[in-house]
């Protein structure tokens, strides 16, 4: 992605993984570049919740933005739905009890599962982990809508159970049933590394400079089919901020002592808020995570 403004691009800010760090989000929204333009749009790359101290408050804050906010689902957002459905048990690092103990828990979860896996607008794609190398934008959107239909149905709890278990590493249009659903959702919410022929390596260590032999970031797979449309994503705090012509990773680890990043599509401007921008009484996020 170059640094030249795109004529006609609406005023949209894409915001990285919040992870329940509502103080970071409030500090970011208070920045004059955003606060002084109340009509600007706010895109969230997913993982609004979990690991941080205020998952319920974060959901309510984003819900309160109304139509200004566009949110795609991340793996931690799905984690809350999986726990609610009884398909997994909470882990020691999960910080979702404030959602489950809230009087409006049903409203919060219903709002969450109504979010999308992919959004495309203003010549950009928004998704949590990325777009599988074998998919062009139209194919990816069709598959996202297919999975979203299952997540939004009355039998959504059964869908969350169906997501448990392994999935194929390689994509085939012939996949069906639970295997197809797991692959689609895994690609949109968990993918980081692939082999050169596009097989996902979901369990591989994804630390830059230490990729397992034979793997590379999904966005560097040769002949990736969605390379002509810039993709905004998160999910990869160890990769950190990455801005190129074709992709931008906006997960800058606010929940582990880093910063929360916003990226303006119009002119590629970056905003970041870190711990020094938080109220004095706020609990350091890194210590909360360490003790979780």
Task: Mark where each language-model region is.
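Divalent metal-coordination and catalytic microenvironments
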Residues: 17, 47, 62, 74-75, ...
């Amino acid at each position: 992605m170059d640094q030249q403004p795109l004529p006609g691009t609406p005023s949209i800010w894409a915001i990285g993984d919040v992870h329940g760090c509502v103080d970071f989000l409030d500090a970011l929204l208070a920045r004059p570049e955003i606060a002084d333009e109340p009509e600007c749009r706010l895109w969230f790359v997913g993982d609004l919740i979990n690991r941080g101290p205020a998952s319920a408050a974060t959901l309510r804050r984003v819900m309160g933005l109304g139509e200004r906010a566009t949110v795609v689902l991340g793996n931690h957002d799905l984690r809350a739905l999986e726990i609610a459905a009884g398909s997994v048990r909470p882990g020691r690092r999960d910080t979702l009890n404030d959602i489950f103990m809230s009087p409006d828990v049903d409203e919060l979860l219903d709002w969450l599962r109504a979010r999308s896996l992919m959004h495309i607008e203003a010549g950009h794609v928004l998704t949590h982990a990325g777009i599988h190398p074998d998919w062009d934008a139209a194919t990816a959107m069709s598959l996202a809508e297919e999975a979203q239909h299952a997540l939004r149905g009355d039998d959504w709890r059964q869908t969350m159970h169906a997501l448990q278990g392994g999935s194929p590493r390689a994509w085939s249009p012939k996949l069906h049933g639970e295997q197809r659903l797991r692959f689609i959702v895994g690609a949109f919410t968990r993918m980081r590394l692939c082999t050169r022929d596009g097989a996902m390596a979901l369990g591989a260590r994804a630390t830059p400079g230490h990729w397992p032999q034979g793997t590379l970031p999904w966005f560097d797979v040769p002949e990736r089919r969605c390379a002509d449309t810039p993709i905004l994503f998160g999910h990869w705090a160890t990769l950190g901020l990455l801005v190129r012509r074709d992709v931008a990773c906006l997960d800058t680890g606010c929940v582990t002592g880093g910063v929360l990043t916003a990226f303006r599509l119009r002119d590629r401007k970056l905003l970041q808020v870190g711990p020094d921008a938080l109220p004095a009484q706020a609990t350091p996020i890194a210590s909360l995570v360490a003790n979780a």
